[in-house]
UniProtKB/Swiss-Prot annotation:
It is an enzyme of class 1 (oxidoreductase). This is Peroxisomal catalase A. GO terms for biological process: hydrogen peroxide catabolic process; response to hydrogen peroxide; response to reactive oxygen species. It comes from the Eukaryota. The modification N-acetylserine is found at S2. The gene is CTA1. The active site is at H70, N143. It catalyses: 2 H2O2 = O2 + 2 H2O. It is found in: Peroxisome matrix. The lineage of its organism: Eukaryota, Fungi, Dikarya, Ascomycota, Saccharomycotina.
Length: 515
């Protein structure tokens, strides 16, 4: 078993020879790796040449399915350190005292791109962190934007498909992209779309961007008191973004620019760090909001729900093997610890299943046995979870395949009092999704964002330009829907987008006429 995640980042598998004698996969020493058995010097090969077959057969199977989405990513190890007491909010052991450190792994990623795509393209960024706590592993599976495109989980596969390739041309498709987003019931995405097409949609590197839970979570203290919580992870390096021209140029010259930047910064001792904050809200406060506390397309006003500092994340160790420690890392919102729970946010509820299930497909049902995913700080014991492909942890030996009453098992009881009525839900089982036509409340925060961009030189202009350049690739009918949607934010913005799109179209016509 690997010692990954302990005092030193090591890959030290027991089946790897320390004397570095080269063998085939069964441990048989190889005299010469590049010879093949054949009849004479120029005759056909022999099927009995197992070393050749062993090598080729493994080569055919060495790739695993890529993530869908978040395929292109980078990662590093580090630690989380508590700087402020929040035990009145959360009873998790990782927050138990100031100065306490917890080992962690963070993976950054783009969302829509393939594994080999550029990491400077316009796209949200994933910001996932696995904490190896003494109460089990905890995954914060976040993004670099505080909101998202949808609030109905059933739309997630459809939305992700629009961010990928046309099934006929295998090309990115502006019609698909904007057709989905401008459908009336999907225009709740407007806030996220504006963040995406501002310069914040092209971060300069992974070190210089924030992370957000987006979702509302439910945290409890050891007295049983609970709050709704959102988490903000603020970069200590300062926000740095690229313009569309800079991002496009870098994508063409170095598609792994952000990955290289992260690796080299850590390698050179320039360890990136982020300060972790939380926003908290009582159930009573939630009922007073003009929107649902479970609406993933909305932010909580910081004037009303101020940020409260918690601690710091520092990344100071590069992976020793990318495949073993980053590609095989499995993050899921369902991976949680005592006192940190999911809320009734419907998209979060759906992610509780879908993320872990994606890892079962991508890595196999025993993905938790892969060293990078092992809860090494708390260990694992449940003899009913056993067998299956690639079970390599001893399979609990002679333990019964069920939890037997006559065995001396230990069950840990949480310290907090059991509250029977923390949340009360009462109603019929119904088919439901949010309002089919977004109301004015769904555009308020987008308008506020546009005003904020107006205080930053050139940012409103860049937003209009970035949208106009992209929407020009869509058909005229969809273009008009885009203009109409942004007119609900600001008529001047809508007109500026249209002007950019028309200018780009005219320029392309002029260029084509020269040939």
């Amino acid at each position: 078993m690997s010692k990954l995640g302990q005092e030193k980042n090591e890959v030290n598998y027991s089946d790897v020879r320390e004397d570095r004698v080269v063998t085939n996969s069964t441990g048989n020493p190889i005299n010469e790796p590049f010879v093949t058995q054949r009849i004479g010097e120029h005759g056909p090969l022999l099927l009995q040449d197992y070393n050749l077959i062993d090598s080729l057969a493994h080569f055919n199977r060495e790739n695993i399915p890529q993530r869908n989405p978040h395929a292109h990513g980078s990662g590093a190890f580090g630690y989380f350190e508590v700087t402020d007491d929040i035990t009145d909010i959360c009873g998790s052991a990782m927050f138990s005292k100031i100065g306490k450190r917890t080992k962690c792994l963070t993976r950054f990623s783009t969302v829509g791109g393939d594994k080999g795509s550029a990491d400077t393209v316009r796209d949200p960024r994933g910001f996932a962190t696995k904490f190896y706590t003494e109460e089990g592993n905890l995954d914060w599976v976040y993004n670099n934007t505080p909101v998202f495109f949808i609030r109905d989980p059933s739309k997630f596969p459809h939305f992700i498909h629009t961010q990928k390739r046309n099934p006929q041309t295998n090309l990115r498709d502006a019609d698909m992209f904007w057709d989905f987003l401008t459908t009336p019931e999907n225009q709740v995405a407007i806030h996220q779309v504006m963040i995406l097409f501002s310069d914040r949609g092209t971060p300069a590197n992974y070190r210089s961007m924030h992370g957000y839970s987006g979702h509302t979570y439910k945290w409890s203290n050891k007295n049983g008191d609970w709050h709704y919580v959102q988490v903000h992870i603020k970069t200590d390096q300062g926000i740095k973004n690229l313009t569309i021209e800079e991002a496009t140029k870098i994508a063409g010259s170095n598609p792994d620019y952000c990955q290289q930047d992260l690796f080299e910064a850590i390698q050179n001792g320039n360890y990136p760090s982020w300060t972790v904050y939380i926003q908290t809200m009582t159930e009573r406060d939630a009922k007073k909001l003009p929107f649902s506390v479970f609406d993933l397309t909305k932010v909580w006003p910081q004037g009303q729900f101020p940020l409260r500092r918690v601690g710091k994340i520092v990344l100071n160790e590069n992976p020793l093997n990318f495949f073993a420690q980053v590609e095989q890392a499995a993050f899921a919102p369902s991976t949680t610890v005592p006192y940190q729970e999911a809320s009734a946010d419907p998209v979060l509820q759906a992610r509780l299943f879908s993320y872990a299930d994606a890892h079962r497909y991508r890595l196999g049902p025993n993905f938790h046995q892969i060293p990078v995913n092992c809860p090494y700080a708390s260990k694992f014991f449940n003899p009913a979870i056993r067998d299956g492909p690639m079970n390599v942890n001893g399979n609990f030996g002679s333990e019964p395949t069920y939890l037997a009453n006559d065995k001396s098992y230990t069950y840990i009881q949480q310290d907090r009092p059991i509250q029977q009525h923390q949340e009360v839900w009462n109603g019929p089982a119904i088919p439901y999704h949010w309002a089919t036509s977004p109301g004015d409340v769904d555009f308020v925060q987008a308008r506020n964002l546009y005003r904020v961009l107006g205080k930053q030189p050139g940012q409103q202009k860049n937003l209009a330009y970035n949208i106009g350049i992209h929407v020009e690739g869509a058909c005229p009918q969809i273009q008009q829907r885009v203009y109409d949607m942004f007119a609900r934010v600001d008529k001047g913005l809508s007109e500026a987008i249209k002007k950019v799109a028309e200018a780009k179209h005219a320029s392309e016509l002029s260029s084509n006429s020269k040939f």
